[in-house]
């Protein structure tokens, strides 16, 4: 069995920052993707750091990445045990178990899917989470069909409203609360582009088969659409360690600790987790 000082789960901004802060320790960083960077790699919009886009900001984080860090990419961590062992499944090596002294969970967050919402009707083609569509448009060159309806007006919903409207599609946003939920800089698209925002309403039914044709709101308005994007919020992804309690060797950082609106806070938490883990290892010695 392989032995590491620190196992980091997640290769986004928090995981990268943690690995850099733990420089000098024997570190393994595991991530599901083909390269580190996390969700930053699919964020074509600017607003990261000094007005960079996501890939540019990720490249800056990785510029001085420690050469000694082991990277287990295209790898899923299946389980973590209280005896400080983890089971990994990777495309390159299949199953393997590793031991660690300190564990940093930097797995980010996941979107709330349609299935978790009280929406009746069929489940046709043409329904995506906002993050799925962001990845498809920015990394795969996909262009959705319009009209587009977006459920939720948080930052990710607004970012995708702007991007789909700039692609020439008709866009309607439906927000359950009485006002828009995103940051002011992201709300600017509502005045700069022909995006309709409906507040104080929600979607209660989806229509169409095999492809979506429209949806009905709680207030009874029918909205025709070829694409429905779910931007209903984000949840920290920490189920992997939910049964461990909070032992001193476990450090949870970034968006799997709490969802942060700004990447700088994610990097700060990752750095703090890496430094704390490194101090704990040195204390054991």
Name every feature range the model reports, one short phrase each.
Residues 1-285:
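Residues forming the flavin
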């Amino acid at each position: 069995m392989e032995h590491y000082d620190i196992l980091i789960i997640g290769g986004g901004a928090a995981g990268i920052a943690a690995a850099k802060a733990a420089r000098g320790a024997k570190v393994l960083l595991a991530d599901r993707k083909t390269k580190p960077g996390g969700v930053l790699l699919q964020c074509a919009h600017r607003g990261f750091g000094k007005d960079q886009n996501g890939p540019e900001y990720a490249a800056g984080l990785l510029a001085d990445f420690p050469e000694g860090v082991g990277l287990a990419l295209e790898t899923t961590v299946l389980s973590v045990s209280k005896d400080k062992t983890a089971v990994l499944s990777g495309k390159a090596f299949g199953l393997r178990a590793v031991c660690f002294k300190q564990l940093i969970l930097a797995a980010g967050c996941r979107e709330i899917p349609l299935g978790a919402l009280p929406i009746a009707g069929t489940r046709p083609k043409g329904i995506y989470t906002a993050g799925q569509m962001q990845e498809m448009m920015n990394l795969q060159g996909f262009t959705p069909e319009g009209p587009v309806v977006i459920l939720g007006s948080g930052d990710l919903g607004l970012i995708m409203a702007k991007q789909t409207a700039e692609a020439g599609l008709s866009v309607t946003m439906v927000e359950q609360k009485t006002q828009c939920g995103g940051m002011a800089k992201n709300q600017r698209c509502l005045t700069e582009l022909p995006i309709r925002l409906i507040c104080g309403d929600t979607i209660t039914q989806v229509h169409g088969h095999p492809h979506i044709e429209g949806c009905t709101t709680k207030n009874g308005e029918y909205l025709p659409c070829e694409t429905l994007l779910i931007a209903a919020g984000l949840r920290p992804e920490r189920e992997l360690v939910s049964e461990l309690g909070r032992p001193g060797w476990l450090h949870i950082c970034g968006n799997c600790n709490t969802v942060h609106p700004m990447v700088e806070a994610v990097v700060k938490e990752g750095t703090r987790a890496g430094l704390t883990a490194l101090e704990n290892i040195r204390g054991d010695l």
